[in-house]
Amino acid sequence: MAGPRACAPLLLLLLLGELLAAAGAQRVGLPGPPGPPGPPGKPGQDGIDGEAGPPGLPGPPGPKGAPGKPGKPGEAGLPGLPGVDGLTGRDGPPGPKGAPGERGSLGPPGPPGLGGKGLPGPPGEAGVSGPPGGIGLRGPPGPSGLPGLPGPPGPPGPPGHPGVLPEGATDLQCPSICPPGPPGPPGMPGFKGPTGYKGEQGEVGKDGEKGDPGPPGPAGLPGSVGLQGPRGLRGLPGPLGPPGDRGPIGFRGPPGIPGAPGKAGDRGERGPEGFRGPKGDLGRPGPKGTPGVAGPSGEPGMPGKDGQNGVPGLDGQKGEAGRNGAPGEKGPNGLPGLPGRAGSKGEKGERGRAGELGEAGPSGEPGVPGDAGMPGERGEAGHRGSAGALGPQGPPGAPGVRGFQGQKGSMGDPGLPGPQGLRGDVGDRGPGGAAGPKGDQGIAGSDGLPGDKGELGPSGLVGPKGESGSRGELGPKGTQGPNGTSGVQGVPGPPGPLGLQGVPGVPGITGKPGVPGKEASEQRIRELCGGMISEQIAQLAAHLRKPLAPGSIGRPGPAGPPGPPGPPGSIGHPGARGPPGYRGPTGELGDPGPRGNQGDRGDKGAAGAGLDGPEGDQGPQGPQGVPGTSKDGQDGAPGEPGPPGDPGLPGAIGAQGTPGICDTSACQGAVLGGVGEKSGSRSS
């Protein structure tokens, strides 16, 4: 038992070795040829349109294009709508001191101010001292003054006379010259003396020296309006003052005249791609462009499925009936005629109406074929007849036998068109005949009715993207579209620097004090000051008509007491517009405005020339399709009669028939029937 168990692993190893050797000896063969294509499968149903994908990321900015040629100035556009007043910007830094401008002309007098005394003005310069005044009148005597203070001790008096001793004295007299004694103590103040008499008028004193200029007195009451003086000399420009506060926004002015269109500037760099706006309205179709140059013919695509037959068109209208031809008598069978000579080219005859069908005579013996005649000129195409009633469907015809290809004969004279026969059933399709030589190009038939939409063929391979065509010429300028709606107001840009300070104007005439109003509104000012302004203008006009004569300088009046401070004045009228400031830095990009209306469609550019791409790899073999079911298509619309075909080769001479019998009764009946129909047609 131990022997067989030990041999089992060895047998397994030998079997595995043989299997591995056999597997190594096998090699992979060459791939076989592709199998035949399977039948086409059923056309798939149209899939549901997918949802619109999210907008793609904005692409990188393209290179800056070459600057275009400046275009012709366009027509002046309609005046724009008045803009919206912008927000008040911040005051810019003061500008540099400009050169003094020319002095402006004297403006009209301003409106009088509101009631109330203004703030006192700055002290004026000291005036020139006037001439000395004359001798004034003697004033009245003044009141008695208070007792004065004791004066200082006076100088020692002169020596007194020698005194005399009184009687009984034994003393000697003092010498004549005695030394002065010491000064005595100050005496008591004396009593008020009696009032002295009024002294006489003294002499006129000399003019004193010019005193120092006194302090400026308070502003006096405003005087009446004086005459307008002559225009003074132009003063020196004052120093540049600090920038004033920004005044209130002025009233909106009338829209200005649109200026001439400027030259087209250089093309700027492409900005960031904006958000996709809503779909605009369909624009008006533009003018038809010039036909483009035909591109090279592309490679034939995959053949599509046969479309369904079109709806049968309406039958053409029945043509005018031809004039009745004289019915010929039925003759006996003629002998074979001699070959006739080639007839000369006949003139083009008028197209006659179709005659009535005569009774078919017995077949005569075929004549000897004559020489082929000269081909006649091609007749003009007749008018298309109106659509007639649809006839009943005839029985299906027997399948024809495939004929041999004949030689192309010369074109014969056009035959008279026969009457339109009844429409027969669609016959079975016979075997395809051999392709004949290409005939002469026939007259173009009228466009048939459009057929039903054929089944969708299999989608072809996607060709390579052709190169973009050259840019078309600039089309004519379209008519100006309606003005678009104004966009959203953008963020106000930073304020520009302050403009140069203008030359101070000539001070106007001081107006009369107005009546203090309750409200300093514009309407209130107009109501209060309308008449006063008219009166001031009338007075000014009257004074201007008079000759100007400088008046004498009046005496300065006494300085009045300072008046109480008046109420603050109302906001003045907006001043004249200053010069334009420097251009500020470019503002930030605003939000994209609403999408404008779609413009007119431009002219169609020239067709681009496509390039044939490289042939693609052969695709994998499709799955086996389901065999399709064939359906007979609908009959197509009958086309217009084509040009007469080439005459065929003369046929073989047939067997001679039996002699016929001439029966004139049928001919007479045909004649009578034709005359009756002719008269009936005329009467109708």
From Swiss-Prot:
Disulfide bonds: none annotated. Residues 66-82, 221-237, 498-507, 570-586, 617-628 have a biased composition (Low complexity). A motif (Cell attachment site) lies at residues 423-425, 601-603. It comes from the Eukaryota. Residues 200-212, 264-282, 344-356 have a biased composition (Basic and acidic residues). Glycans are attached at N483. Heterotrimer of an alpha 1(IX), an alpha 2(IX) and an alpha 3(IX) chain. This is Collagen alpha-3(IX) chain. It comes from Homo sapiens. The gene is COL9A3.
